[in-house]
Amino acid sequence: MTTASTEPVSQPGDAILSVNNIEVIYDHVILVLKGVSLSVPRGGITALLGANGAGKTTTLKAISNLLHAERGEVTKGTIVFEGEEVQALSPNELVRRGCIQVMEGRHCFGHLSVEDNLLTGAFTRRDGKAAIRDDLELVYQYFPRLKVRRTSQAGYTSGGEQQMGAIGRA
């Protein structure tokens, strides 16, 4: 993956996520990322594009603090989400705060309805059924097609609809 600059595009105060000049090493010797920086403005959308093996997934794993599971580590630079260093937070805490990685695969439960797929995991929430229902309606605002297909069996929806469901579930 190449970067145009090692400096973030927006100012740190404007960004919900800042990755500043990070290096990632696996097994204490294999350098897989060097000098990667990016900044995601609050309310913005950012895409990581690159060839196979360019470091997109490794960058996402670093942001999600998931590298240790694969004997990887950030050895240089900083990753800050909502004003806090990612390395100081557990992956579960990052998810609770809204830093969620949606993988390329769709990972829907084909035998469940679209809506049941969206509600997967909601049972672990502690903020009540009304908040869950409000979040579901927000997903339907972002993805009106899912509301139309909410009673359809997820396994019979298009790939794009399944990806919308994966994003909505996150």
Set out the residue ranges of the language-model regions.
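Short beta-strand immediately N-terminal to the Walker A/P-loop
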Residues: 46-47, 101
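Short coil-to-helix segment of the ABC ATPase nucleotide-binding domain corresponding to the Q-loop/switch region
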Residues: 60, 111-121, 150-151
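The feature captures the beta-strand-to-loop junction immediately N-terminal to the Walker
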Residues: 49-54
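ABC ATPase NBD Q-loop/coupling interface
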Residues: 66-67, 78-96, 124-128
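Conserved ABC ATPase "signature" region
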Residues: 8, 84, 130-149
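ABC-type ATPase nucleotide-binding domains, specifically the catalytic core motifs of the NBD
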Residues: 27-28, 46, 67-70, 114-134, ...
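Conserved ABC ATPase signature
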Residues: 153-157, 161
